[in-house]
Amino acid sequence: PSMFYEKVLHKKPLKISNKPSVLKHSMSLFVIYFSTKKIYDHIQHHTIIFNKRHKELLKDIFDKKVMIDDPSLYLHRPMATDGKGQQFESDSFYVLAPVPNNSSNINWNDYGDKFKNIVFDILEDYALPGLKKSLVDSFYITPNYFEDELNTYAGSGFGIQPIFRQSAYFRYSNKAPEFNNLYFVGASTHPGAGVPGVISTAKATEKLILKDYGIS
């Protein structure tokens, strides 16, 4: 809803608490998809590499919104469960790093390649030895992708933050109060984020539409 109000409607929501610039939006993500000619059998389906200064890192991402050079990482290796890549003697992954959203004004066009190398260095040191020599192909997406292609506000990865004053009733309503025929679903909409929350928003919005249009 934040992006829709700002970019499509070009107006502010009636509820001042739902003004996009007032709301706290979630972090964004830097995601690298890559394949290797080496099979890393010791890596499970899900791996998390925590930064040693975890609390300070969160402050840099959420509060200071500054560029980081020591991210925590989530590594996803589907081959650990699927196994089909082994017949081709290759492996595939994606790795994501939480980063500030685009309200930080970080120029990802300039910094993207450097940050990719930082991530690969961490992976090589802590999880995937010999990674750089084993790389077959890779590409990455930045907060710009979330903002420009997925139309998320400031490139946020998960909508508005699920803090108390932005939870449940305080999130965007399922029906826009300014219009009789505008409805919302999604992570930033009541009742909340996450897959169960998003499904719940769809069910709640469906009930509103059926009621408004007299459909039983």
Region spans (language model):
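A conserved FAD-binding loop/helix module that cradles the flavin
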Residues: 187-209
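Hydrophobic, well-ordered secondary-structure elements that form the walls
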Residues: 34, 95, 123, 182, ...
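A glycine-rich dinucleotide-binding beta-alpha-beta segment and adjacent secondary-structure elements
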Residues: 74, 129-191
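Short glycine/proline-enriched loop/turn "hinge" motifs that connect secondary-structure elements
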Residues: 83-90, 173-178
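Conserved FAD/dinucleotide-binding core of flavoprotein oxidoreductases
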Residues: 2-6, 35, 87-122
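Mid-domain catalytic core of redox enzymes
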Residues: 1-86
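Active-site-proximal substrate-binding core of FAD-dependent oxidoreductases
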Residues: 211-216
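Flavin-binding catalytic cores
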Residues: 39, 66-68, 108-148
